[in-house]
Amino acid sequence: MKIALIAHDRKKTLMIKLATAYKHILEKHELYATGTTGMKVMEATGLPVHCFKSGPLGGDQQIGAMISEDNIDLVIFLRDPLSAQPHEPDVTALIRLSDVYEIPLATNIGSAEILLRGVEAGFADFREVIHEGDRRPLAF
């Protein structure tokens, strides 16, 4: 799976703790991240991470573009809901694209842990089925 990791500044330490705790799961997948988050995760865990630009400089949009091309399977976005973000429209667009393309999205540590444990248990294998067949968003 291709997993995107994004964290607002006040959540970066939490992302590092998450990546460290679930390194045994994350190491089996391709990781993508916005700039600073990706660098911090790499430094703390030694995991390879493809780093895009920092979120406010377009990194969120770069990950959004990957989602729209069906090149991301899961997004962990540890948001800081108590601080204003200068790139809030980009954040909203990324969340919207995750919904449009049926990409599992965690926006807090609780949902991130559940998604990662689900990946480990094989509960996200439906993404592999999508990659084998039609590349359009699911229609229910």
Swiss-Prot record:
Active site positions, chain numbering: 60
Gene Ontology CC terms: cytosol
Residues that bind substrate: 8, 12, 34-37, 54-55, 87
Domain MGS-like per the UniProt entry, residue ranges: 1-140
InterPro entries in UniProt: Methylgl_synth, Methylglyoxal_synth_AS, MGS-like_dom, MGS-like_dom_sf
Reaction(s) catalysed by this chain's protein: dihydroxyacetone phosphate = methylglyoxal + phosphate
Enzyme Commission no: 4.2.3.3
Protein name, UniProt field: Methylglyoxal synthase
Gene name, Swiss-Prot/TrEMBL: mgsA
